[in-house]
Every structure is written in structure tokens, then in C-alpha cells.
Amino acid sequence: MEDVLSTHFDRIEKALSTLVDSIAAYNPSPQAAIDLVAADDQLSHGLDQLSRHQANHARILTLRAQVEALEEQKKSSVTALATLRHELHATPATSFPADTRPVRFDELLQYAKNISQYTVPPTYRERAPEAASDKDRDKDDAASSGVNTPAHAPAQPDSDAPKDRDNADNKPAEVTAEEEEWLEKLQKSQIAWYPWPSEEKIRIGNLSKLMYWQARGKDVDDFDIPAHEEAQRKGLAGVVEAPPEPEPVAEPVQAQAPRPARPAQPQATFDMFDDLDD
């Protein structure tokens, strides 16, 4: 590209020199002016070509950088795949026994739902005991009242410092607001809480039913316990019927003896004016 531009510059320089010499000799040459204009056009075209060349060169450098980056990415990907393949071949294969029973996902989710109410969250922490703080409060109350205070208190040994350090190291983890609310509700309910179900709940659960039917010789894998219980309930409902209500019995009406008639009382008559008739 430099040679092409040098040629254009030499041509325009010669055309310009010829035109200047003709003007200086008082004999201007029109052809020299035309050659100068043509040399200028060729120089402009060469400069445009140089601009495109520089843009293409920058584009080539960018593409080379991208090629190098992609090459490095390809090498790292191949290395990772080789490492993963080596780890997969080194991983021991899991061999399941022949008597393995497949478990459906809905059955597994139902089992997790049943035991979720008897489990605690992994972040559960019991509240720190308050016995030490109560003792310190009692000591402070006794000191403020002055009761049983000796005239000259003996110097306390420095053996409490390691204990305080141990207590600081053994501090329980902080309890979140949600856990604190749950603990407050549990404390207010005044109900003994255990992280496992009670014996009564275990006896009425599905595991107890499985043990019961297995002890009676049923194959729990093929035996449908809910369907059998439903059939038993329907059978009992058909056999046991409500006793018919007793029909009311008409009791004989006893004939009452006629009451004795009362003697007729004499009717009172008005006899005030009987004396006047006489």
C-alpha cells in the first residue's frame, strides 16, 4: 500500500511542477492542469483505499483475538471433559440387590408428608438455660440488701476467668425470629413435646397396620389394606341394621263407674210480699 501511495504522490508532484514551470514561462499548459487534476483524483482514490485497508486490518486483528480465545475455550472444554470422563470411570457403580422393591414417587411424597409433623427443622436449637442468670440475680439482691455481708470480704481467686471464657465459647447459636416465635407458642401451650410420635399415634398409623397384616400372613406388597378395610366397613353396615321401633299398643280403656247423682237442692223463692196478700 505504501508503494501505491508513493506512486500517486510522485505523479501529482510531477504534474504540479510541470504546471508551475509553464506558468513561470508565461506559457500555461492546459494539459499540465488536466494531468494535475487526474493525479489528484488518483491520490484521493488511493487514500480511500488506504482507509479501507486499515479498517480491514483492524477487523483481522479482532478476528485473530477471537480465534485465540475460542481456541483456549476449546482446550479448557476438552480438558474438563477428559477429567469428567476419568472421574466417571473411577466412580464405583451402584449395584442394587435382586429383592429391591421400586417405590413410586407419590408414595414417597405421602410418607414424607406423614412424618413431617413429627420432625423438627434442622436449625432448631433449645433455649439456653437461665439458671446461671438467676443465681447472679440472687447474689445482686443479697448484696444490695446487705444481708449476710461480712465486714472484710475475702479476695476472690482468679479461677472464674477460665470459667467465663468457657461459658463464652459454649454460647448457643442465635435463634431466629421464626424459631423464637415457635418456641414461645410451644412454651405457652404447656404441652410436653417430643421429636417423635407417641405410642398411641404409632398404634393407629400405617406402620402398625402393615405389621398387623404381615403378622396375619398377608403379603403387604400386594395386599390392598385401604380397599380391604372399606369392604369390611360396607359388610358391617349391611349386616348391622337398626332394630325396628316398637309399634304403640292400644291400651284397653277401663269403663268408669257412673258417679252417684247429687240430691236436687230446693230452689230458693222470693216471698217478701206474701204477707200483703193476707
From Swiss-Prot:
**InterPro entries per the UniProt record, alphabetical:** Mediator_Med4
**Entry's Gene Ontology cellular component terms:** mediator complex
Coiled-coil annotated residue ranges, if any? 57-88
**UniProt keyword Glycoprotein present:** no
Q: Where in the sequence does UniProt note compositional bias of the Low complexity kind?
A: 250-268
| Skewed-composition ranges (Basic and acidic residues) | 124-142, 160-172
Q: Name one Pfam family in it.
A: Med4
Q: Which GO terms describe its biological process?
A: regulation of transcription by RNA polymerase II
Q: Where in the cell is it found?
A: Nucleus
The similarity annotation says: Belongs to the Mediator complex subunit 4 family.
Q: What does this protein do?
A: Component of the Mediator complex, a coactivator involved in the regulated transcription of nearly all RNA polymerase II-dependent genes. Mediator functions as a bridge to convey information from gene-specific regulatory proteins to the basal RNA polymerase II transcription machinery. Mediator is recruited to promoters by direct interactions with regulatory proteins and serves as a scaffold for the assembly of a functional preinitiation complex with RNA polymerase II and the general transcription factors.
Assembly? Component of the Mediator complex.
According to UniProt, the name of this protein is Mediator of RNA polymerase II transcription subunit 4
Source species, please?
Phaeosphaeria nodorum (strain SN15 / ATCC MYA-4574 / FGSC 10173)
